[in-house]
Amino acid sequence: MPMRLQKSTMCGLYAVLELAANPDRQVSAGDIADKYDISLNHLAKVLRALVRARLIESVRGPGGGYRFAGNPKRVTLLDIIALFEDTGLDLQEAASDDHEESRALHKVLRDIDEIAMTTLRSVSITSLLKVIDTERRKTERGPNGASARHSSAGRA
């Protein structure tokens, strides 16, 4: 069962990744919205939350936009996800807690929750950008591993 993230969370992740990948320039909200096919109004709300969290900065004026404000080696997936998601597993303590089965189930679910949090906390923006770069290079090489630029399709 894959992890399901809210639309706001995905927008936040896309925005942070886009800004961290372009540290030398400001990126407009419109550019991010266009690239990821996100509603500009929804993205604006997400960007405000990221600014409040001091993960990104808003740059006003000509050529303005947004830029990443954190240290990409220290900012983690959990830092961003926690802004938009309830990251705690809400296990309702039922009256059946006096049963071994209930206590065991709660323990296992808490352990799973802690593993997920530890994993999200261990993935930095820098490491995710490296994964993206690797995926981009695979796509450029094409399905047979040959570089798309050097394929025989373009030769006479």
Curated annotation (Swiss-Prot):
Domain HTH rrf2-type: 4-130
Coiled-coil zones: none
Keyword list, A-Z: DNA-binding
Domain of life of the source: Bacteria
Signal peptide: none
DNA-binding keyword on record: yes
GO MF assignments: DNA binding; DNA-binding transcription factor activity
GO CC annotation: cytosol
Biased composition (Low complexity): 145-156
Database matches in Pfam families: Rrf2
Gene3D superfamilies: Winged helix-like DNA-binding domain superfamily/Winged helix DNA-binding domain (1.10.10.10)
Renumbered residue ranges of the record's region Disordered: 136-156
Entry-linked InterPro entries: TR_Rrf2-type_CS (IPR030489), Tscrpt_reg_Rrf2 (IPR000944), WH-like_DNA-bd_sf (IPR036388), WH_DNA-bd_sf (IPR036390)
NCBIfam families: rrf2_super
Protein name (database record): Putative HTH-type transcriptional regulator BadM
Organism encoding this protein: Rhodopseudomonas palustris (strain ATCC BAA-98 / CGA009)
